[in-house]
Amino acid sequence: MLKPSVTSAPTADMATLTVVQPLTLDRDVARAIELLEKLQESGEVPVHKLQSLKKVLQSEFCTAIREVYQYMHETITVNGCPEFRARATAKATVAAFAASEGHSHPRVVELPKTDEGLGFNVMGGKEQNSPIYISRIIPGGVAERHGGLKRGDQLLSVNGVSVEGEHHEKAVELLKAAKDSVKLVVRYTPKVLEEMEARFEKLRTARRRQQQQLLIQQQQQQQQQQPQQNHMS
């Protein structure tokens, strides 16, 4: 007797797998601005309110939010429905901006990874009790030609991996491991970098003084030992 074929139901793990749909935030914002302009022509809504909203949508801050949200959406690792992913992305975006309170807002900078490197140096880290910063933009390098990175930018994440509170070597390893391109989330805090560099310079100065004092002590000991050796001979 022929048995009817049975199609097994998807497992719970299969049901939770979702395809991440690409965002269309740029297009959505452009469409919103277009609708605002049409409303302005109709005269149904006070012009000053429409202009204020349009100004917000076109602001650098709104652009930064859009870029960070899109970056979080692409890199965050969650399973579940699109609504759940959207909530997780929103929370991660809010957390990124909350962490930068009192400083410049976060930015997303993407650089191509070539044989010549990325064209910048980093300093700081957990072992130095400081954030990780872009300390130098190499003249003529990839970062300078791209123009999106600044000396004084604090490095928040590399290709979706947070480096806040991490050791210096962790950030260096992530940068070296990147292939084709690297996406950085940074925020501009030059005053903090200046304070950190000043602290490091004090430590270097103190270390040089200790080395000089040690050298002087060694020379004095040698001078004291020479007369004793001459007397014994």
From Swiss-Prot:
SMART domains attached to this UniProt entry: L27 (SM00569), PDZ (SM00228)
Localisation per UniProt entry: Cell membrane; Basolateral cell membrane; Cell junction; Postsynaptic density membrane
InterPro entries in UniProt: L27_C, L27_dom, L27_dom_sf, LIN7, MAM_complex_regulator, PDZ, PDZ_sf
Region annotation (Disordered) ranges: 214-233
Annotated PANTHER family: PROTEIN LIN-7 HOMOLOG (PTHR14063)
Subunit composition and interactions: Forms a complex with CASK and CASKIN1. Component of the brain-specific heterotrimeric complex (LIN-10-LIN-2-LIN-7 complex) composed of at least APBA1, CASK, and LIN7, which associates with the motor protein KIF17 to transport vesicles along microtubules. Can also interact with other modular proteins containing protein-protein interaction domains like PALS1, PALS2, MPP7, DLG1, DLG2 and DLG3 through its L27 domain. Interacts with DLG4, GRIN2B and MARCHF11 as well as CDH1 and CTNNB1, the channels KCNJ12/Kir2.2, KCNJ4/Kir2.3 and probably KCNJ2/Kir2.1 and SLC6A12/BGT-1 via its PDZ domain.
Name of the protein this chain belongs to: Protein lin-7 homolog A
Species assigned in the record: Mus musculus (Mouse)
Lineage: Eukaryota, Metazoa, Chordata, Craniata, Vertebrata
